[in-house]
Amino acid sequence: MDAAAAAHEPLLAAAPPTSGKATAADGYGRGRHEEGRRLASAEAKRLLRLAGPIVASCILQCVVNMVSVMFVGHLGELPLAGASLATSLANVTGYSLLTGMATAMDTLCGQAYGARQYHLLGVYKQRAMVVLAAACVPIALVWAFAGRVLLLLGQDAAIAAEAGAYARWMLPSLAAYVPLQCHIRFLQTQTVVLPVTASSAATALLHPLVCWLLVFRAGMGSKGAALANAISYGVNLAILALYVRASNTCKGTWSGFSGEAFRELRQFAVLAMPSAMMICLEWWSFEILVLLSGLLPNPQLETSVLSICTRVSNEIGAGQPQAAKRATRVVMYMALSEGLVISFTMFLLRNVWGYMYSSEQEVVTYIARMLPILGISFFIDGLHSSLSGVLTGCGKQKIGAAVNLGAFYLVGIPMAVLLAFFLHLNGMGLWLGIVCGSIIKLLVLIIVSCCIDWEKEAIMAKDRVFSSSLPIFWAATPL
């Protein structure tokens, strides 16, 4: 070492290596470490550019239902309980199923776009709309007779009647919800995320006005809040449909409606059903909490509070980014940081959050007691949602569905029933049980993600895309 170098050598520097081999090995190790940090930093920036608008748009989309429940909550405890129960039934029997089936587009469109088979994205979007529209027929029948269904499930008669009326006024929302979900995924899988965020923001800003006009100005009460959802979904859909038709960004992926949408429907359904089950099995477990809360003492209070906790959890936790090998590690760090910040914020705001949903002091106080548990739930949910996104990106929805089935239905819900009904923890016990299921899911998904063979997955994705590829001259013809 020369004098100049020695002058800058720290006093407590490590002893120099004793051989040239060691020096080369250390240099190689440091080089790999620096390269890994550089790649991780680049991946984090890329994910934030993509995921930031996606997360924002998902939260803004949840604002529609959230604001509707807020308006109903200020009509009284019974309307809030009825609207909450109807929304939970709609989520269990409709929205969760449709959202889950639409996530098949995340796999198909995402991999087709990566393989530069751009014309397939438009075909997949139309195919998804056909399959989801068919699924709406039985869903509409359940919603039309929601009051009777809830009575059969043992719910309070007054709450069931209120919920039945609310559910019937939610029926028009199906007509807009299906194409809206397909348009959103069609754009997001092309990394076209800012228009989705902008349309969701415009809808979120408009929705409170629509709710006020229908609920109070027109005197429709809770029914007006349900109808407002359909109007806002329709506005969001109209904005995105105009963008797809007019934008140069979608020229290569959308060329109009095509008869190809009616081909290979079975193949789409084969992927859509595991996708739906993966989403539904987790989503249903949270909505079952609301249904179970109707069987507790003071069902109006328990149902109101549990539904608010479910809405808050869904709206904040929506939209975790999807990634692969290196991105998985990066997104877990991001989810960890996000979870800590939002959980802490929820804890600080626990005494004021309830006033957004209800003027009843009893409801507000109960929510304040529940929010610390909800913060823990959200923190865990952020981590396992990121890993679930990895499975969706790989097309492994069957594994995700099996994990959700075991975690929530063999552990979470039985534990919730035990804590709520046998240990008499009521609504708090229901939520603690689901937290137990979430912890099991997180642990299992960590193990599954560590076992993924990424090279094999890349080959399978390529095979899946090109086995479905259409000749360019088969692509849709503009109307």
Residues covered by each model-derived region:
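Short alpha-helical transmembrane segments in multi-pass integral membrane proteins
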Residues: 1-51, 108-176, 194, 203-273, ...
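Signature of the first transmembrane helix
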Residues: 19-31, 45-106, 273-293
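Helix-terminus/linker motif at the lipid-water interface of multi-pass membrane proteins
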Residues: 55, 59-81, 150-157, 213-220, ...
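Residue-level hotspots within pore-lining transmembrane alpha-helices
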Residues: 56, 60, 64, 93, ...
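Small-residue hotspots at the loop-to-helix junctions and early N-terminal turns
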Residues: 77-84, 88, 163, 167, ...
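Alpha-helical transmembrane segments of polytopic membrane transporters and translocases
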Residues: 82-98, 231-235, 303-311, 439
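Helix-loop junctions and terminal segments of transmembrane helices
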Residues: 100-113, 290, 309-320, 388
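Membrane-interface junctions at transmembrane-helix termini in multi-pass inner-membrane proteins
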Residues: 107, 176-200, 378-405, 421
